[in-house]
């Protein structure tokens, strides 16, 4: 859609402004989305992921990669998947689902661009998540690096509505190092982390875990505005 194209172009401009490396022309990884057919007739839609890379600072580790990702699509004016289907014509902005996660990835890219990590980082914004993880499914089959060089994937989906300093983190059992990594990372902020072991779930980290890549999915829980036109920026 024009909105999807505009969002992708914005993300690409931000990554370019940080001086990140493009892994495909203009940071855009094009693919053809084939959402599940509900009427018995399959459709094909051109779409895109937005992908950028930041080389690591440690020569011994820069050939290992961490993917930091989030989906940037939402429902828009479609009532398919909406929990307020009677609100026809309403624009479902998806401020929490998932502009919040997209913003988190962009902000992490900005921070790391000034202070690179030891390992290389791939920043990836996926389209087609709401239609069945289509963008991330394509990405894991067409990564700019070898699959076995990706040591972890961090997914941010719906991270803008935290209550009582509580964050749910899925996938903590997918790597033995994750519990201690989270503990160290949380030392300063002292958030209440509700860890869940399983790496599978209804978001893009599942595409990576299916490839045996350790994953973490950060999530601040569901709310009454989920998949409704009331998921607006003023509530973030």
Feature roles, as predicted:
Residues 52, 61, 68-74, 78-133:
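Alpha-helical metal-binding/catalytic segments enriched in His/Glu/Asp
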Residues 12-23, 36, 55, 107-117, ...:
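Sec-exported extracytoplasmic/periplasmic mature domains
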Residues 2-17, 26, 100-107, 111, ...:
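Extracytoplasmic/secreted proteins, especially bacterial periplasmic and envelope-associated proteins
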Residues 126-223, 234-235:
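Metal-dependent peptidase/peptidase-like ectodomains
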Residues 15, 21-22, 35-38, 57-59, ...:
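Solvent-exposed loop/turn segments at secondary-structure junctions
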Residues 110, 114, 224-236:
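His/Asp/Glu-rich mid-to-C-terminal helical/loop segments that flank catalytic regions of hydrolases
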Residues 1-55:
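A non-catalytic alpha/beta surface segment that caps or lines the substrate-entry region
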Residues 2-4, 62-65, 77-83, 133-137, ...:
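Short, solvent-exposed loop/turn and secondary-structure capping segments
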């Amino acid at each position: 859609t024009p909105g999807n194209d505009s969002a992708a172009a914005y993300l690409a401009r931000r990554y370019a402004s940080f001086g990140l490396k493009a892994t495909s022309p203009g940071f855009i990884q094009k693919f053809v989305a084939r959402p599940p057919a509900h009427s018995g007739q399959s459709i094909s839609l051109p779409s895109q992921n937005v992908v950028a890379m930041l080389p690591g600072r440690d020569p011994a580790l820069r050939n290992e990669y961490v993917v930091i990702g989030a989906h940037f699509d939402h429902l828009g004016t479609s009532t398919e998947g909406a929990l307020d289907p009677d609100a026809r014509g309403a624009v479902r902005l998806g401020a929490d689902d998932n502009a919040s996660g997209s913003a988190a990835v962009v902000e992490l890219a900005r921070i790391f661009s000034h202070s690179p990590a030891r390992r290389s980082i791939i920043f990836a914004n996926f389209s087609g998540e709401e239609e069945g993880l289509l963008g991330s499914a394509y990405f894991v089959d067409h990564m700019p690096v070898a699959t076995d060089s990706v040591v972890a994937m961090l997914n941010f989906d719906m991270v803008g509505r935290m209550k009582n300093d509580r964050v749910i983190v899925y996938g903590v059992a997918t790597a033995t190092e994750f519990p201690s990594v989270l503990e160290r990372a949380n030392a300063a902020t002292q958030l209440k982390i509700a860890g869940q072991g399983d790496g599978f779930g209804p978001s893009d980290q599942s595409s990576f875990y299916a490839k045996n890549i350790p994953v973490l999915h950060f999530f601040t829980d569901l709310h009454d505005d989920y998949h409704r036109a009331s998921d607006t920026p003023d509530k973030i």
